């Protein structure tokens, strides 16, 4: 039986408070280490070189020297503007377009298909214990190839779940219990935290002898992140496992296990980005004594084939950005196209045609939001922003004549891009998405304008006043609403009236997840500023 919870109960304001509390691969040789730059062939520094005064976030305005074209904003050529001194992108257009891979074409597709069938047989064959099947499923997931075997995995989990007698599992150790708990919860099965009761002593603490079981502790640690409200035992499990894993690192003789522990303490599985995790785990799995060579070779080949697809998508996005021309017309903006593509890749990474379409379009929306945010936060004067916001709120192309030159480019480019997305949604899903897309942009720019007025007027909002705007000005609702239509199709994923109503009124699942994202972003920003 799977967990079924209403959206309202999952994302109520009452539960919000609880919610707040990281190359191509040679298939038969050693893998190259590329934890972040996995879709690029060459080693590049991920850090952007910036000037020493990179962030100018104080109230004092700084004269930002732009090109002559940009200074044709008004007759007055001495407009004083803020400047964030964003560093230029390190991902040049020519470099991105030069990316290539050998892992394309029928030869590799046939080779991958053969290996896939062999792994599929592995998934279906009977094993000595259910735990062995769960370990295989977990390995397949961590290697990043589980999307090939979704039906097989669900079938295995259904069978194991229905055959499990949780009340008579006293002989099952900490590792197996934790793995079962994590996998079942990840796939939506109803599993009670009572399965951990047998590991608790009379004083309500985890039994002391468990501190010596490093493998079990690691499994418990990963399971502890699948927590819901009022499950304090999992919070205690996390604290207990972290404490003893750190202690055990000093005495672990198995280098592979030590690597797994260190990595998990840095990035738990529940927080990890799938493609980055897969790239890292392929290396680790290849060093294990019980490695399955067929599975390993399939994971390597699949990674390389996917990487080739991702490279082509990035090249496509780069051509769109080059043709849009914003980076040349408005050089004060952040060119973060590659980072925006990575964002979309963390959401969905499989090679299906609809997934490729989603990543390409989602990258565009992300970069549009980033650029317009810079107009409000950095470059635009208050008077210009009022005109800019008015154009967005009325969404009338004729209002472009009221805007400065750089805003004309931006407004028309954004309007055309959103209209194109609306057309694609109509073509693929049979729904007129434009009213919903336009509304999200109007609401976003309205919040941007409100915060711009706060800045220029020296107004410090109360916490409630800030939060009422922050969840929207973080732009996550805009990305979510565009994503809803990008994922839609008339056959596989049709648009529903319930869904349209939810995005129109910003259902709690949108609002509160956006709030979490915004507050986490603010916290990370303050932390980065504090370390400079």
Identify the residue ranges that each predicted region occupies.
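Terpene synthase/cyclase
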Residues: 2-532
